[in-house]
Curated annotation (Swiss-Prot):
Membrane topology, as annotated: Lipid-anchor
Lipidation (N-palmitoyl cysteine): C23
Sorted UniProt keywords: Cell membrane, Lipoprotein, Membrane, Palmitate, Signal
Organism lineage string: Bacteria, Bacillati, Mycoplasmatota, Mycoplasmoidales, Mycoplasmoidaceae
Cellular component terms (Gene Ontology): plasma membrane
Lipid moiety-binding region (S-diacylglycerol cysteine): C23
Protein name: Uncharacterized lipoprotein MG095
Signal peptide: 1-22
Amino acid sequence: MKLKFYKLPLITTAFSFVFLTACSTPQSSFFLPAQTTISTLKINGMENKTGYFLETQRSRGSYNPTASLTMIKLGDEKEFKNVDTTKQDEVLFANIYGGISSLLNFRIIQPMLTYWNLVNNSLSQIGSTNDLITFKDSGYKDQLAKALANNLIVADEGNNNFWFGLKALKFDTVKLQANNTATSSTRASTTQNTNNKIDAREKITINGNGGTNNDQNATVQKLIGIENIEVEFSFVKTGFNGNEIKFEDYVTDSSPTTSLLKQVWKSKWNTELTHTSFKFKLNSFNVLLTYQLEANQKSQYLPNGFSFLFPSNLEGKIDSSKSYWNNLVDFSKRTTNEENTMLLTDLQKKQDQVNRFVGFIGQNHFTLSANSINEKQFNDASTADFFKAIFQKVSINE
């Protein structure tokens, strides 16, 4: 394959970059200035088409597609390309799935890595204290802890360096119950709510005439679920070119750079490196899509806003919306508007706690300690709650 190189402008930020891809090896080599954020992923959706999304110059926080350089690769296409704004499928893919990938990256993955990198013995604390992650192989845990805490392993000033980070991210979007409540006007409605279910690919049609006349600007929200989230951490060979970092292929057990990585690892810690990749599964969570509607307009809308909601299967934290959660198992059942309202109220209360947790990490990531995080700061959302919400309970033995 002919390699392509992308040279991107420098981004000034206090946070390290994260590189995500769902390919077994990168589709291209990237010359990236330090601090640039890249996100690439593989998604099941769009009539089972395979899609990859790449975004640079993304600011922290809410997703803003107009403030980023976005490229996509759909189906059998060989290279990334700019989004064609005249093609609905491409716009839909970039807006919806790109927004979801940003939320995954900045609201789950990056805080998780930040916490792990800065709290001493954090893997043992998370795994043993909360009975969340069980490591049958102690060497696996020790190697993962060292790699996370030293995510750029510098061997020399040349090209014999390795960066450790998130290699693969895969997830499915699934149909969930719709919340068609307009927060600005109660008269806005959709034409596709006969069974009160939605799909992430669904466009809504607003009719400005007749019995559903919406004579005011309005906001319509729809709830979708993100499931079957799989992540893989691995090493990628890097080299420096001035203030730029060059990414090459990911290291596998049989790649040409494996022996070099093991040499660098042993010289640094005097132990043998036996694992080159580390896989986890994450819990499902929900995303609230927001549609801004114009008064007296009949047209199709794509979602233009995203809100990350607390992971959907947090144990023992659901009160008023239990029937809603049961209904998610059986899509033939319907939920009432009251149940939808209670669900969103419950989720948003918990999301406020997560927001404060993530914000605290972001603002204090150089001085974070286990003692600085406690239940008092986050009401009933403790550190244990945070990680239980993110990870599936797993036993790891690779």
